[in-house]
A protein has these predicted regions:
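A membrane-interface helix-boundary motif in multi-pass transporters
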Residues: 170-183, 360-382
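A late C-terminal transmembrane helix in Major Facilitator Superfamily
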Residues: 337-366
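Cytoplasmic helix-loop-helix junction between adjacent transmembrane helices
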Residues: 117-155
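Juxtamembrane intracellular "pre-TM" segments in multi-pass secondary transporters
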Residues: 2-19, 197-228, 407-411
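C-terminal membrane-cytosol helix-exit motif in multi-pass small-molecule transporters
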Residues: 183-201, 388-392
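Helix-to-loop junctions at the C-terminal end of transmembrane segments
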Residues: 72-84, 170, 266-280, 362
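Helix-loop boundary and gating motifs at the non-cytosolic
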Residues: 16-66, 219-256
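Structural signature of the two symmetry-related core transmembrane helices
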Residues: 87-101, 282-296
Length: 422
């Protein structure tokens, strides 16, 4: 019995039985990215080919949209803290549905496309922190990793299937595609309106003891670690396409992406308990080592290297992204929604830095005729930058903690992988 308590429940025992609202929320975690990825991955092609925008303008629009979608999560978390989780998800879906309807109208009035795209990204920014917080609301500590992993698996499944369904129709029948996605989001919005609220728990009840600023109570180490993880991972996300298509084909690039999605869908739920119990320092070491190994393997440029590198990078980010979220929840005194919003901001900052700095480095490698060096340099950063987190960890550990408020503090056993109740 003692061993079972230490190891925690298995995946099946953690997830089941599922209540009706949680079943619907997990289904929505699949349907929402399914609809979104029927459209968003093709926006550069749609804006350029169908609406005639210049590539420079397209790049600026997509960069602005990505920044809103990631970094706006901190506003979504704060809004959920103020008006409640269900209301925030509902308003976010209304905004996002309006965005997809706007894309349909943009076929008649092209300038509307930019604002419609921004609306969809604003909706995503508002929705995700509240969605994650609702998913783990009232769930005991040992089951939280399983629920977060199941939500991530559903999200990645939707991201994988959406482009496969929509690819043939983006340029040939975009009107029908946008109408179908808008209808899907309308249905999901109606379903969310029927979810039970969590406001009875008083989402703002901690305001008297916790400052209400957007970054107040941030768990600094998981925040910085998340920004660094996304910075390094997005070297792969941003630049694999041009590298893989050049050395293999666009079809093979799709195979690599499908492998990565499949690994997240299958491995993260199964490994969630192990990741929860893993000491934080060990999880960071394992995750960044996986990223380093995968990025280094990509430098070979062969088809086998693309598959192996993608797999190693995905396994590394499975550990890093989940563990950083769990540690942020454990260390911060803020509500779950605010914590997820803060972590989303960190992800946005990291992804943005990767696009700016990584783009310059990849351009240098391309001009020199040795783009393989780009991946080796990225791998070296995976080994050289994470040790700087140790300095931050020691500095945070020395910070005094007021009596009676130790939940977000670093303690002597802060790496035991526990996710305390909130």
């Amino acid at each position: 019995v003692g061993e079972r308590t230490t190891r925690g429940p298995g995946l099946r025992a953690s997830l089941f039985p599922l209540t009706g609202p949680l079943r619907f929320l997990l289904l929505s975690s699949f349907l929402i990215p399914l609809g979104s990825f029927m459209v968003l991955p093709f926006m550069s092609v749609f804006l350029h080919e169908r609406l005639g925008m210049g590539l420079g303008t397209v790049g600026v629009v997509l960069a602005m949209a990505s920044l809103v979608q990631f970094s706006g999560g901190i506003v979504g978390g704060a809004l959920a803290d103020r008006i409640g989780l269900r209301r925030t998800m509902l308003w976010a879906l209304v905004v996002r549905t309006a965005g997809f309807a706007g894309l349909l109208l943009a076929l008649r009035w092209p300038p509307l496309a930019i604002w419609a795209l921004v609306l969809t990204c604003c909706g995503a920014a508002l929705y995700l922190p509240a969605n994650k917080a609702y998913l783990v609301h009232g769930v005991d500590d040992e089951r939280r990793p399983a629920f977060l992993s199941a939500g991530n698996a559903a999200l990645n499944a939707g991201m994988a299937v959406g482009p496969l369904i929509a690819g043939p129709f983006v340029l040939s029948s975009p009107g029908w595609l946008f109408a179908a996605v808008t209808t899907l989001f309308l249905a999901v919005t109606v379903g969310h309106a029927r979810l039970p609220g969590t406001e009875g728990e008083d989402p703002t009840g901690s305001r008297e003891t916790v400052p209400s600023g957007l970054l107040a109570g941030v768990a600094l180490l998981p925040f910085v670690a998340n920004a660094l993880a996304f910075y390094l991972y997005f070297h792969f996300q941003h630049f694999l396409a041009v590298y893989a298509v050049e050395r293999a084909s666009s079809a093979f690039y799709s195979v690599v992406l499908l492998l990565c999605f499949t690994l997240v869908i299958v491995v993260q739920p199964l490994a969630s308990g192990l990741i929860r119990r893993m000491p934080y320092a060990l999880a960071l070491a394992v995750g960044f080592t996986g990223l380093a190994a995968g990025l280094a393997v990509l430098a070979a440029g062969t088809r086998a290297a693309l598959l192996a590198g993608g797999a190693l990078i995905t396994l590394g980010d499975i550990v890093l992204f989940l563990k950083n979220d769990l540690e942020a929840l454990r260390r911060s005194p803020r509500s779950d929604a605010v914590v997820f919003g803060q972590q989303r901001l960190a992800a946005g900052l990291g992804a943005c830095a990767s696009g700016v700095l990584g783009g310059q480095l990849y351009g240098l490698g391309e001009r020199a005729g040795h783009t393989g060096w780009f991946w080796l340099l990225a791998a070296a950063q995976c080994l050289l930058l994470p040790p700087l987190l140790l300095v931050l960890r020691r500095r945070t550990a020395r910070r005094p903690v007021p009596d009676g408020d130790h939940e977000g503090a670093l303690t002597r056993d802060d790496t035991d992988g526990r996710v305390p109740g909130r």
